[in-house]
Structures are given as structure tokens and as C-alpha cells.
Amino acid sequence: MKITFSPELSIPCEVCKNQSNGYHFEVLSCGACASFFRRSVVSKIKYQCKDGKKRCQIRYLDRHFCRYCRFSKCVKAGMKAEKIQKNRDLDSSPTPTDQNNCIPSDVLHDDGILIKDIRGLFKQFNPHNASEGCSKLEKLTEGLQFIRRNQERECIKIIDEMDSESLKDVQFKVIGSCATWLLFSSFFQKLEENEKVVILERLWHGWTVLEFLSRSLEIFGNKVIDEKIVFISDNTAIRLITAFENSLKTASPKKSESIKKKLELSFSVIFDELALHFINWKPTEIEISYMQWQIVWSVAEQLLSGNSLEKGEHFTEQLSKDLHEYYVRELKLENYAFRIEKMMDIVQIVQNNFY
């Protein structure tokens, strides 16, 4: 008998063994357990074990969980309460810090200023070209194709240095690309402007790593790892480590050493971990879009609440169903657990290092 695995069933929830739909609070889990954990932390609920032994089995097939043991299992699995924004003031939400930026703030321009310049895009851009009748995941993939539509594949300029103004221009363009891609999500389109802005502000660093790296590996292959080359625009790539070493020549020895230490860790993650995962697997555009949304949701679920949070959970669950249909109907795969595991590995590396 032929057996197919949905993306959720191939990797079960670490709490209740139900269908997982991505990482929540750093644990691969289902939406129900993630919501339960969030409610418990925000409401500061103190549970009592149903039978007093504190060893109850947590299985999704059971109608009534022991809430004490379910919460304990969430914590034991690795869910972190500090990942929950208990007072969700979106307008005053802090920007990402050096600890989780792929490039330190010593090097980057103020992304808050750049994002304010992009606010108008949320009002003006409407991805009307998204095909009618296609799935939500296919629409996100159309968005990926849209922001890559002018990608050069032959006449590529490779540079070894970049001045401050050029870096600012790259930042502005990539934040714009991230915002544009997000608008291919029907869920994101309907969010309030302040919700969109704060998600974009928190998101773009890690999103950029995955976008630039996947695009670069598709065209350059192993040269990305060997020469540390990545695209920074449609027709320009940069030898990343060489360029930053050159840019630090005029800095004071103390500042130069400080920035180098911060960059070395990020570059190691990008080239020694993420790039190798891609090279050994070669994901499709559909899979890249799915991974990007998993990263989006890991940020957004910490910031949203109420109706927005609920709709986002439904949208994310639908993407998992769309991915299953893609594997079964398009790729004709009987067992795609390997591909799901690869995607989740990449998503977790980005989450752990850039957020």
C-alpha cells in the first residue's frame, strides 16, 4: 500500500504528537499547543495535576488533557516564556539588537528610518497579478518570483568592497523586497499598518539571509561556500568577508576587532551551516517560500494578538496543507519526510541565530 505523509504528520508535535505546523517558541509543535502555552504564560495560570502524580500522558487523541502536565511538557520540550510579548505595544516595539542581527548595528544604517520610507508601499502596492485560483503557498511563490524577476544570471558584477552609501542602498532595497513579498500573503495584506511595520522591522534581517543565500546558491553553486560570494542586488554579488575586511581598514583597532568578532559568528552560520544545508538538498521555490513564511510566523506570532493572531495561525496551517498537496500532486512523492526535516533544520538555524 502506498503511504503519503502530510508535512505535519512526518514530524509530530513535540508536546502532544498531533500534526505539527512549524516552530513555535523554538519548539516544533502544533498550533493548539502553541496557543495553550501562550495563554498560560500571558494569563499566569497556575494549574493542578488531574491525578496529583504529575506524570499524565499528553496525547492529542485524548479529549481532556491534564493542563498541568501539558504545560510542563511544553516547558520540557523547550518552549520559552521570554519569547512571548506580554505587553504587545506594537508602536513602541524595539528594533532588533546586535545579538540577533546578521550584521551589527555598527555597520548597518538605522533600519527604522528606512522602514518608515517604505510604509507607503503597504498602501500602494497590490499584487494583482497573483493568479486566481492558486493556493496561498503558490501565491507566496509568485511573490518570490516577482521580487526575483530581474535577476541577472550571466552578466554579474562581483565586488570586493562597498561604501556606506552603497550599503544603505542595499538595505533599502532588501527591506522593500521583503515588504513586497509579504504583500503576496492575503493574511498580511489585511493587517493594520502598525502590525505590518513592526513585523517587517523585526523580520527583515533573517529573511534577507535566506533570500540572498538561496538566490546565490542557485546561480553560483559551491562558489558561495568556497569564495563567500552572495548576491546583494539583481546584477551585483559581493565577496562578503573580503568586503567587510576592506571596510574595516580605516576603523580603529578596537572597533575593528569588536565588529570582526560579531561578524565571524554570523558568517560561520551563513556559509558553514546554512549554505551546506542548501547545497546538499536544493529546495524548490515552493519550499523556499514555505521556509520564509515559517520564519515570518515565528516573528509575527510573538507580536500579534486577538483576531490577527488567530487568522495568522489559520493561514500558516493552510500553507502546510498546500505544501502537502504540492508534494503529492506536483512532485509525486510518496514519502517526503526528508525534505520536511531539511526545511525545519534551515528554519531553526535562522531562528536561533538571527532572532
From Swiss-Prot:
Chain ranges of zinc fingers (NR C4-type):
13-33, 49-69
Q: Does the keyword Nucleus apply?
A: yes
Q: Which Pfam families match?
A: Hormone_recep, zf-C4
The stated induction of this gene product is: Transcription up-regulated in response to intestinal colonization by probiotic Lactobacillus fermentum strain JDFM216.
Picking any one GO molecular function of the record gives: DNA-binding transcription factor activity
Q: What is this protein called?
A: Nuclear hormone receptor family member nhr-127
InterPro entries reported in the protein's UniProt record: C.elegans_Orphan_NR, HNF4-like_DBD, NHR-like_dom_sf, Nucl_hrmn_rcpt_lig-bd, Znf_hrmn_rcpt, Znf_NHR/GATA
Q: State the source organism's domain of life.
A: Eukaryota
A single GO CC term for this protein reads: nucleus
Where is the protein localized?
Answer: Nucleus
Every copy of the NR LBD domain together lies at 126-355
